[in-house]
């Protein structure tokens, strides 16, 4: 990571950094502060550092631990934000850990107090005949199978509206990651 940060600095780029110690800190409350102090010590001084990537698409059961990680990082390094990306609204209630998508986003904002609410929504689907493929996990299989059921996944603007509503209610800015690179079952 240090080499990448140094290269990005030379190129005028900024990085939201991922480090395995952050992932370990989520599940290890006993060593959380120690792990995160080491992360901040290693990276906070790099001008190319934009922020710390905590996790992608968490279930609501993880929100209390994510809130603790976010707060520790904010206390140790108030200059660089801690980043968490949420599921889109086509995730199941089981994946979310909440009965509705709005409830999931609202609980995230209330529990984690993020600097920004971020989510991705990939609604352009190839729509090819479904083949039997094991993607390695139940979650990935669900996403893969759902992708072949529709050509244009519905709910893109409903997703924006749910997040916009929570954003306005909590005075937290939001961003959406849209599909720009064709991969897996997704198309441009």
Where are these regions (language model features)?
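Glycan-processing catalytic domains of CAZymes
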Residues: 1-188
